[in-house]
């Protein structure tokens, strides 16, 4: 169990799992995969929620991570995007919660509002018959509503670090009964600006806390940091050279100038029949620029970035999930963990600034083993970044063939 705490002294409906034979795990000795939900000792009402949610068989990461979490161990769980990480979190949380108490017993921190909200919804779905109450504490929503919900009593809080910390300091979120902390997408949370906020939250948590880190990528420096707040963690790791998702075909298109990217995008539209696509840009300004330009050329697109009010972001996400909108232009606020089943194509209009974001972006195009295509627009000064991504993931990104339409 954790913790030396310096302040005191992280799936889907539709059933299938990825082809586990293709995944290579570096896992703590003694961790045996459990291939059936029925063999996990899960409460019947939670199990009913799991099956109703659409799972038939645990995915690779669920087979290995759920039992150590339920046994109270600290866990570092690494799984590719789309392997059922969110559902693994929800299942574990629903099993450990004692519904006879109205106090918060599990806290999940996520880097984006959308991921925190999706986690909350998954917990509510899987925990429906167990009457598990979850609430998303996220910036952009009403503070008053957060206070009201928390004071009424919930079992699980899924939130972003800033708002969660605020609720703790206001004493609306009482931490004395929290026994499980989960850091979802912990690479993003710890390696960027969230580290201080996480430690702020930590200071208020009980000393016998159980800690889990869940992420698609776990760079060496992140694993080093875990020694500060985890005790003998069970490690469930995918080797890095297996991290590019199975079934994702990756290509690049060489564009000499920035201005040529738009024409290239229009040519792609003419060539392809797009079910649903996500187009990633590196800046909010570029998202706005590209969205306006696409609309002026009579393309129907949605767009989203972090400056938009939360209600607007929610409406856009719902529109895209339901299929009413087929093309979403966005920044990396969307790249982590958002589950949309029909996405068949991801276009990196800009290559990501951070190579570790690459897998989060292209992971959208083949969730749970679905096939997908990722196309990267590459200027001459981007070649080095592209090669760096290839080397980092031990993968090959070829020039886009003429028959790309046959691959989507």
UniProtKB/Swiss-Prot annotation:
Residue span of motif Q motif: 35-63
CDD domains: DEADc_EIF4AIII_DDX48, SF2_C_DEAD
Positions where Phosphoserine occurs in the chain: 100-101
Keywords linked to the UniProt accession: ATP-binding, Cytoplasm, Helicase, Hydrolase, mRNA processing, mRNA splicing, mRNA transport, Nonsense-mediated mRNA decay, Nucleotide-binding, Nucleus, Phosphoprotein, RNA-binding, Stress response, Translation regulation, Transport
Effect of loss of the gene: No visible phenotype under normal growth conditions, but mutant seedlings show increased sensitivity to cold and heat stresses.
One GO term (biological process): nuclear-transcribed mRNA catabolic process, nonsense-mediated decay
Binding site for ATP: 79-86
Short motif (DEAD box): ranges: 184-187
PTM: Phosphorylated at Ser-100 and Ser-101. Phosphorylation status of Ser-100 and Ser-101 largely determines the subcellular localization of EIF4A3.
Region feature Disordered, mapped onto this chain: 1-20
GO cellular component: cytosol; exon-exon junction complex; nuclear speck; nucleolus; nucleoplasm; nucleus
Enzyme class: hydrolase
EC assignment: 3.6.4.13
Subcellular location: Nucleus, Nucleoplasm; Nucleus, Nucleolus; Nucleus speckle; Nucleus
Free-text comment on this protein's domains from its UniProt entry: The Q motif is unique to and characteristic of the DEAD box family of RNA helicases and controls ATP binding and hydrolysis.
PANTHER family to which the protein is assigned, alphabetical: ATP-DEPENDENT RNA HELICASE DBP3
Role of this protein: ATP-dependent RNA helicase. Core component of the splicing-dependent multiprotein exon junction complex (EJC) deposited at splice junctions on mRNAs. The EJC is a dynamic structure consisting of core proteins and several peripheral nuclear and cytoplasmic associated factors that join the complex only transiently either during EJC assembly or during subsequent mRNA metabolism. (Microbial infection) Functions as a host RNA helicase that is co-opted by the tombusvirus (TBSV) RNA replication enhancer to greatly enhance tombusvirus replication. Interacts with the viral minus-strand RNA and the replication proteins within the viral replicase.
Subunit structure: Interacts with ALY4. Interacts with MAGO. Interacts with CPL1/FRY2.
Name of the protein this chain belongs to: Eukaryotic initiation factor 4A-III homolog
Gene name, Swiss-Prot/TrEMBL: EIF4A3
């Amino acid at each position: 169990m954790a913790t030396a705490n310096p302040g005191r002294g992280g799936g889907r409906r539709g059933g299938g799992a990825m082809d586990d034979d293709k995944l290579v795990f570096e896992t703590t000795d003694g961790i045996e995969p459990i291939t059936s939900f029925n063999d996990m000792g899960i409460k019947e009402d939670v199990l009913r929620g799991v099956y109703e949610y659409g799972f038939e068989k645990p995915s690779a990461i669920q087979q290995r991570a759920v039992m150590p979490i339920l046994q109270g161990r600290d866990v570092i769980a690494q799984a590719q995007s789309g392997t059922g990480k969110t559902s693994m979190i929800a299942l574990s949380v629903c099993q450990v919660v004692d519904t006879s108490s109205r106090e918060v017993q599990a806290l999940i921190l996520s880097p984006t509002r959308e991921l925190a909200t999706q986690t909350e919804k998954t917990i509510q779905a899987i925990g429906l018959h167990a009457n598990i109450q979850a609430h998303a504490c996220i910036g952009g929503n009403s503070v008053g509503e957060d206070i009201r919900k928390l004071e009424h009593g919930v079992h699980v809080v899924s939130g972003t670090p800033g708002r969660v910390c605020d609720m703790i300091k206001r004493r609306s979120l009482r931490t004395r009964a929290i026994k499980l902390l989960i850091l979802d997408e912990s690479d993003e949370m710890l390696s960027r600006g969230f580290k201080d906020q996480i430690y702020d939250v930590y200071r208020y948590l009980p000393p016998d806390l159980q800690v889990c880190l869940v992420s698609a990528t776990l760079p060496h420096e992140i694993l080093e940091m875990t020694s500060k707040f985890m005790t003998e963690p069970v490690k469930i790791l995918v080797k890095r050279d297996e991290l590019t998702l199975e079934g994702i075909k990756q290509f690049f298109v060489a564009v000499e100038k920035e201005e040529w990217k738009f024409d290239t995008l229009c040519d792609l539209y003419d060539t392809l029949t797009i079910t649903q696509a996500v187009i990633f840009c590196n800046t909010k300004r570029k998202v706005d620029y590209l969205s306006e330009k696409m609309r002026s050329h009579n393309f129907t697109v949605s767009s989203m970035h972090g400056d938009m009010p939360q209600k607007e972001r929610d409406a856009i996400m719902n529109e895209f999930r339901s299929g009413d909108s087929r093309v979403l232009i966005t920044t990396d606020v969307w790249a982590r963990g958002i589950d949309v089943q029909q996405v068949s194509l991801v276009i990196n209009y800009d290559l990501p600034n951070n190579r570790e974001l690459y897998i989060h972006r292209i992971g959208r195009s083949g969730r749970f083993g679905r096939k997908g295509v990722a196309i990267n627009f590459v200027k001459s000064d981007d070649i080095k970044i592209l090669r760096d991504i290839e080397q980092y993931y031990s993968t090959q990104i070829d020039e886009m063939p003429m028959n790309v339409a046959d691959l989507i």
